[in-house]
Amino acid sequence: MSAPLPHHAQIIIIGGGIVGCSVAYHLTKLGRKDVVLLEQGELTGGTTWHAAGLVTQLRNSHTLIEIVKYGVDLYSRLEAETGQPTGFDQTGSITVARTEGRMDELKKITSLARASGIEIEPITIREAGEMWPLMRTDDLVGAIHIPKDGQTLPAETAKAMAKGAKDGGASIFEGVSVTGIRRSEGAVKGVSTDQGDIECEVVVNCGGMWSREIGLMCGVAVPLHAAEHMYLVTNPMGIPKGIRSLRDPDEQIYFRRDLEEEGAILMGGFESVAKPWGMNGIPDDYIFSLLEPDWEHFKVFWESAVNRVPAMKDAGINRFYVSAESFTPDNRYILGEAPELKNFFVAAGLNST
């Protein structure tokens, strides 16, 4: 039998994906012990369980670079600290350019990353081909290499942070739905759930795709929406352990070694015009669910992928995933206290991009 909900907590976190688990973990590291995380289903449900798990430090602002730089450091030590396997594999990454304009952009980002202490270097087309032997390179003009990038298993990483949070004194409750945010005099006072009310001083909205609806409970605007994201896993094709993840931003596609199917490639893409989903609300029971495959929508990515890695065509497709992630209008994270309500914080809009 699970423990009853407390009547009071200093901080309540809504959402048990990787973001909510991370907030709980880091609050305990800061000495906060009276922390309660509420998850409507099971930990890692929603987006975390199916996320692609790319870990990259390639960003176009100093602030974002500092965030992802810290993430790499955290992932590199989290498993040893918590004893919970995370799947983190620091293989490095390659990003290729098909045009001079793209290469100029990568050089600018390289300069920004170096100023933030990121180990990053331009490499020749030949060097890129040696690092990724199955990659077609005759249409490329250049590439960059980030040795300390990698990949991880998001669900396992979230579980490791949840364990670290509990070890640090936080309490985690699954199967608890938040039904309202209690307010008084312009500030948070507590939450209502399907299992009773909890008074608190601070609420952190880490609801992922549900963050907008959670915000609406208390008059806070959280500008994000869900869209379909698709990726596939090939049949085994001899991809060795330790191979770097690969990005082709001109074609908006990415590749990495699949961490579950030995020797296979995981490939996905981010279209400029994505398919919105859940515009009439995200179902509460959309926890470990997939959407109907839409091969016609994904086909352009497959064609680009086969152009970049021709051996994929003969290998064939083992699995095709279609699920939902949340996106913001400017593709930036939403982090901080809401201006509409004191002590109501939002950590949302983080996704596979």
Regions found by a protein language model. Give the residues of each.
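Conserved mid-domain beta->alpha element of the FAD-binding
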Residues: 25-29, 340-353
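Short beta-strand to alpha-helix junction loop
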Residues: 66-69, 95-105, 144-166, 173, ...
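Glycine-rich FAD pyrophosphate-binding loop
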Residues: 28-48
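Beta1/beta-strand and adjacent pyrophosphate-binding region of the FAD-binding site
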Residues: 5-19, 36
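Dinucleotide-binding Rossmann-like beta1-alpha1 core, especially the glycine-rich loop
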Residues: 52-131, 252-255, 262-264, 285, ...
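Helical element adjacent to the flavin cofactor pocket in flavoenzyme catalytic cores
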Residues: 144-201, 210
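Active-site lid/adjacent beta-loop-alpha segment flanking the redox-cofactor pocket in flavoenzymes
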Residues: 221, 236-348
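Central helical "cap/lid" subdomain
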Residues: 197-244
